[in-house]
Amino acid sequence: MTGLQMRGHAAMLLFSILVAGSFIFGVRIANLAEPAAINSARFIIAAILIGIYMLVNPNIKTADFAPLRFKPWRYLLLSSVFVSYFIFMFEGLKTAATVSSSVIFTLIPIMTAVLGYVILRHIITRRMAFALLIGSIGAMWVVFKADISNLLVFNVGKGEMIYFVGCVFHAAFIPLSRKYNCGEKPIISTFAILIVGGVIMAIFGYEGLLAVDWLNMPAIFWTGLLYLGIFASAVTFFLIQFAALALPSGKVMAYNFLTPVWVILIEVALGLGWPPLLVSAGIILAVIALLLLLKDETKIPV
């Protein structure tokens, strides 16, 4: 494994932790404003933060922005794909059950691996396929809290189908990011995607933005929004752009398997108690899957 690949894995490990934190904060502020307003604001905050960072960073030169002039439509495409995930998520979650949507989310690594082959011809080895399979099973086991009764209420309705389409967009973003990178530094491409994505989200959620009483929102709202904007948007977008250039698509999104695990550990740290002991079986499967994916191989494809 090369140093770049090791940094790619480290980036996605941090990514999975930060995304887990976004679920914790997201639950606490979800009912305080329209989802479209919250996500529009997080894009704007993230873009401003990265813009300031690039402005004061002596290592970012004017010449680094030159590749953006080459086929600028790439960023309209990439931003539209990523924002589409949020739009379909908003619509789908209006009627989709929480458990059902969580299960669909755990399928993103498999979707990403398949789309990585279609778009980039990234080979899916037997080891990778096996790791993705047991990782999905482990993540679902955690989502269902090792309770068969939760599995029995799983239902695929209109909301679930809409959310599934959104997850396909999410999965496609990784291989498309690599395909349409023309030499930009990850921080530059992240900034461009956030700017264009922020405009698209603002157009989609302008009614929600205008409806929020920004000056009188509680402290927890601003704490959660700043976390989402800084850590779950600016930092995670950069991490995923960096990892997409260092690792195969399936390996990048496989770190989503760890997100339910981190959510549990964060909840325990907050004093919300441990889940049933049987849930640990799912955690073990997720860890095994990631260990299998750490091995770099180019042997017989599936």
Where are each of the predicted segments found?
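Glycine-/small-residue-enriched transmembrane alpha-helix faces in small-molecule transporters
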Residues: 1-41, 88, 152-179, 199, ...
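Juxtamembrane helix-entry segments on the extracytoplasmic side of multipass membrane proteins
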Residues: 4-8, 32-36, 40, 66-71, ...
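C-terminal-most transmembrane helix of multi-pass membrane proteins
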Residues: 10, 43, 221, 257-302
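Specific transmembrane alpha-helical segments of multi-pass solute transporters/efflux pumps
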Residues: 18-23, 57-101, 105, 141, ...
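Transmembrane alpha-helices of multi-pass small-molecule transport proteins
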Residues: 32-84, 111-112, 169-176, 190-209, ...
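Helix-helix packing/entry segments at the starts of transmembrane helices
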Residues: 39-41, 99-107, 176-199, 230-269
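C-terminal transmembrane-helix exit sites in multi-pass transporters
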Residues: 49-54, 108-133, 261-281
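Hydrophobic transmembrane alpha-helices of multi-pass small-molecule transport proteins
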Residues: 50, 124-146, 201, 257, ...
